[in-house]
Amino acid sequence: MGRIFETRKATMFARWNKMAKAFTRISKDIAIAVKGGGPNPDNNPALRRVLQNARHLNMPKDKVEAAIKRASGQDQQAYEVVVYEGYAPHGVAVMVETATDNVVRTVANVRMHFKNNGGNMGNTGSVAFQFRRMGVFRLAPEGIDQDALELDLIDHGLEEMGESTGEKGEKLLVIRCAFESFGQLQAALEERKLNVLSAESEYVAQTPVQLGEEQAREVLELVDALEQDEDVQHVFHNLA
């Protein structure tokens, strides 16, 4: 009974920690979006994207509103988006997207995570050529004629479309475009009133790397350490 309780408690705390990290990431995204385009989502496509992501994560409305209010104030911390590059064990390329108010702290922490987990932090451009920055939309596929939608969206920047599975096993329709077409495709999806669950820019690996189970575990230990860092927003890699 005791062990079962401890296991459940550990699982619960892990879920809470993951949720807290996700809410912190969204709050920073809100701050960056508001600084770039103002607090009114009607006039700020970047903020609309972040609010979609917040709803998908079930972030409480009061927390979202508080984040927008803070971001609109004079005392809001100014976050800088900085991307770091490096290699995980076994030559896996890694891109680390951060949002920081202290670059000196962040670069030191990212370098430490690479070093402590068998990787090497690289210079700008050392692995970026192995990725392509893209706009990625995830939608609920129910009621969508995918063939018709694909033809319809090609003129708005769509490059790739396919089905995937979410963390909870739910079916997702994933749509990708060049990063330069992100806003155009977002507008097209909004105009068609489709159920967009999330919309983010991602570094998509061009040539995924296959590894054995033990080697992959070593890579994912580094990824996990990076994702736990308070300044890290996203970690992208080319592990298949």
UniProtKB/Swiss-Prot annotation:
GO BP, one annotated term: regulation of DNA-templated transcription
Example of a GO MF term: DNA binding
Coiled coil: none
Subcellular location: Cytoplasm
NCBIfam families membership: PRK12378.1, YebC/PmpR family DNA-binding transcriptional regulator
HAMAP family (alphabetical): Transcrip_reg_TACO1
Protein family (similarity comment): Belongs to the TACO1 family.
Protein name: Probable transcriptional regulatory protein AnaeK_1694
